[in-house]
Amino acid sequence: METTINSSPQTLPFKFHGKSGEYFRIWIVNVVLSILTLGIYSAWAKVRNKRYFYSNTELDGSTFEYLANPVAILKGRLLALGVFAVYSVTVWFIPLSEPIFVLAFIAGLPWLIVRAMTFNARNSAFRNIRFDFNSNYREAAKVFIGIPLLVMLTLGLAYPYFAYRYRDFFINNSGFGTTGFDFDAQAKHFYLIYLKAFGALLLLGLLVAVALPAVIPEVQSANQLPGQELPVQSPQLVMMMLLPFLVIFPVYMLIGTYIHTATLNTAFNHAYTAGQRFSSNLKVGRMFWIYLSNFAAVLLSLGLLIPWAKIRIARYRLENLALQTEDNLDGIIAGEQQRVNATGEELAEVFDVDLGF
């Protein structure tokens, strides 16, 4: 199914109102209490984090809500901890049982992923209407077991196909109220992204292969008399050792940022529902600068600028996202509310245990 949008649809931009100072206070309290309670408070910390970002994300004058119960998240984590304890004790006394646990985990992984996605979606709401996620084990197993096996058998060549199928699985099974989302991207869109990234890696490898033989002799002979070895503490030797990191790390980060940015744009620009379509216009250069400067700031501040970094990237991503709609959003929401009420469900039956990762 493909929806045709009018030539002049109404564009509703997303806005983000989060502030670093506000979020820092939430973040530091979460960290301290999680440590003091040996991780028990981390369930409440997760809810507080999500509620802050949701409540500061605005669309057409309204903000989003995160409705999860921290106790449900704590139950899920305690359950996971219990399973891990059983695994550890059993493997300690019966080492040959480890493959059985590994196979059981792989078999249960699709169910865990569906449950996590369902919990997160049904605890997210906009204008009192919950989002939804509906899938089954068989469909999830194809995406999260079958295709990864294909990726291994093809030595990674099928990874772009996995990237496509994962987003297709998530978007096509997601919905807002009773209205489902659709995804009209194709695998070729993702192959093109990774092909460009692979080409950049090849170019980087060629440049390094050409440059190193020319650079190393120059560095060695810079302050070296004939017949002498370069001192271990020589600035030239230190620079020669740091040069690959200083050059290659930013390039690898740039390539990774390109893949991430292009994938986000592709996923949003091909996600739609009846009469509505998303529009994402993230720029690789801007994203790269944000990630690089965030990395440096967090490193130099020993982690204290993590809240500032999170607010910064969230603001840029959301302020470059918009919803194009044929009709007034108020009318769409009102119609959706009537359909939800007519079903008698209100999509409020959520799992009481969060098994999210």
Predicted regions and their residues:
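Pore-lining and gate-forming transmembrane alpha-helices of multi-pass membrane transport proteins
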Residues: 26, 102, 193, 197, ...
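Generic multipass alpha-helical transmembrane bundles of integral membrane proteins
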Residues: 134, 141-238
